[in-house]
Every structure is written in structure tokens, then in C-alpha cells.
Amino acid sequence: ALEVCKDEILGHKYAKTHDCLGRLLKIYDFGTRIFYHLHQKDEDAIKVGMNSKEEAYHFLDKPLGPHPETFFGVHASIVRENKQNEIFLPYLEKWEGEEILKYSKAYMNIPGEGFHLPAGLLHAPGTALTLELQESSDVMAVLQAEIEGLKIGKDLLHHHITGEAWEKDSEAAVLDLIDWEANADPYFYENHHLS
């Protein structure tokens, strides 16, 4: 459709500089929470030939599912006390369990509300029926080794990290992708909540 009606679909001005909208709209309804992960910022995504990925969630009326809460960010004290590597690196090296979530904050998935999530923010979406608008990229780094007994392959931790970075810093390379200040924002809810 874009090849035939590019100006009509994208608008003349936008079509001059863009080949596509670069956005996807998804509706998801998972039986379990999605793993704790992040989408790399522009400067990191481009290193692996990809685009960064921003997301926005809107929670629909029903069903909420068994875990209608989403984990976002990290506790502010972790960054304030500069304990990111001390706390997170052992989880990434050991790669088991889901206890890494205890260092994040869970927010209820309230129908009619949602969240905006720039690239670089850690998150583990809940099970509420969700309308998600996202940039069209699959770039990510997964930091959670297991969800409710289901093992997650460690390759998802470093799949979108350069081979050089992984060889040099291994699991610590993932921690360099995280926007720690944004993840520890004491006003995270106020700055990202959509109503």
C-alpha cells in the first residue's frame, strides 16, 4: 500500500523523509508476565544494525489475567548508592530464577490507563489485555532467567549486543545499556503514567 499511496498514507511532508510509519500496534493477552528486559537506546541499537524501540501501553477492560501488574525500572537507592553492578551482575552471571524482579517496582494494570516507556528502561509487562504502540524494532536485552518455572535462554541476554562488547565485558556489557537515572527516577509513575 505504501508503494502505491505513500503520500496519502504518510502525509506529503512526512513521506519526503520516511519510507514507513515505523510503528506497530499490537494487542496482547498473555497468560503469564513477560520477562524483565529493555530495548536499547539509539546509540546502542545502531551498533547491532537495529533501531531503538519506544513503547506505550494502554490497558483494556478485560481480562486482567493472573498478574495484572507491570514491573518498571529499579529502586532509586540502587543507583543513588551506585550498586548497579553489585546487585545485578550476579543475577546475570548465575542466570537462574526470577528474583531479579525484587529490585524493580510493580504498578497495577488499571483498565483505561497506561504507561509510556522510552528506550533504555527495564520493564516486565503484566497479563492485562494491553494495547501497545511501539516502534518497529525487536532490539532487546533480557535480564530475567526464568518466568514461573519456564527457563529463558541466556542468548536473549546478549543477542543484541556487539560481539566485541560481549567478549570484553560479558554480562557487564548489558548493564551499560541501561539508562540508570531514568530507571531510578523517584517520579517514575508521574513521568510515565498515561491516563
PLM features: what roles do these ranges have?
Residues 1-111, 124-195:
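Active-site region of the double-stranded beta-helix
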Residues 120:
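Pseudouridine synthase
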